[in-house]
Structures are given as structure tokens and as C-alpha cells.
Amino acid sequence: MFTATELLDKINSHIADLQFERTPKGLYDPVAYVLSMGGKRIRPVLMLMAYNLYKEDVRPVFSPATGIEVYHNYTLLHDDLMDRADKRRGKETVHKVWNDNTAILSGDAMLVLAYQFMAQCPAEHLKAVMDLFSLTALEICEGQQMDMDFEQRSDVKEEEYLEMIRLKTSVLLAASLKIGALLGGASAEDAERLYDFGMNMGVAFQLKDDLLDVYGDTAVFLSLIHI
């Protein structure tokens, strides 16, 4: 079984080797730029870890793991545009390097690419994987809209906030684990347990993230916040 660090190295190498050879370059250069920014790669590593619980050779899951990371970065690209953020991981955001329209269109392309990568899995698991991935993508949109709605309210209840972070953050971590388990041949019970674990982990991460955003010294905690 591989360590998390070993799996991180593997998926980083795989993503670094991606070639976007289609044209126009004005669409695909921002995609390559976003993926070159790095990051913790938590979601693909979780998928590989879950798969590795059941299968030794993790290479068959590189494409779906790449899909989950491309999807995550697509959401960040559009988040940065909506928030008018100038920096992401210490580098200028896509709408600053290029423009708003390019950020929208390249983000859309990343969403399609994420589905293409995710679909590169064995036929016997394709429907279950794509159903879960599609539901997760929709739930993330719902969570983002809730977050935007809450910015206009001063009466947000605790249960509403928890539901928002479940949708906005937790479901993708949970899906990463469950997809890895399904592809590895896990039982339905095991896959669901890993999903629940990912859900709880995501809530814990987002609670910490939000606390640091409110109370943390950015100079000290920048490397800790955001997953």
C-alpha cells in the first residue's frame, strides 16, 4: 500500500504530463495554467487511497483522479471570478492574466474535461461513478448559491450553515473516496462508510478554514487554510 505522499507524487506527475493539444490555445492555455499552480491535490489523493485499500496498482485510477482534480480547479477558477480575487496560490488568477470571458469559457472547458477524465473507468462502474459525480457537481452548485444567499442575510442558522458547507465542500471529498472505493471493487457498505468519513472530514476542514479566515493571521496561517 502506498503512502499519501507517494500517491501525491504519482498524481502530480500524471497531471504535469497532461497535454492539451486542441485549439484554440486561448481556451486551453488557461486550463494548463490553472493546473500548473499545484495545490494539495487532496481529492485525487483520497480517491487513490480508497482504491489502494482494495487494489495494489493505482494506475488504472489516474484518469478519474485527474477528473476530480480538474473539476475542483474549475470550481476555483469560477469562484475567483465571482469573488474578483486577484491571487490564487500566490499567482494571478485567470481573469487577471486573461479576462473575464476567458475565465468563464476556460472554466466551462475544464468542466467538460473533468467529465471526460472521469468517464475513463471500467464499463461496469461507469454508471455508478458518473451518477455520483453528476450529483456531487450539482450539490456543489447548490452550496455555492446558498453561500451567496447567506451574504445577504444576518439570520443564518447553524443548521443552514452546516448544510451549506456540506454541499460546498464536503460532498466532493466524500465522492472522491467513494468513487475510489467503487472502482477498487469495495462492497456497497464499505463505499458508503468511506463516503460518510469524507463527509465528516469535509465539515471539519471547512469549520477550521472558516475559523482561520475570521480569526487567523494570514501571514501565519496561509499554508493551512483552504483545501
Tell what function each PLM region has:
Residues 1-18:
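N-terminal amphipathic/basic leader segments beginning at the initiator methionine
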Residues 16, 20-225:
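Mg2+-dependent prenyl diphosphate-binding active-site environment of isoprenoid biosynthetic enzymes
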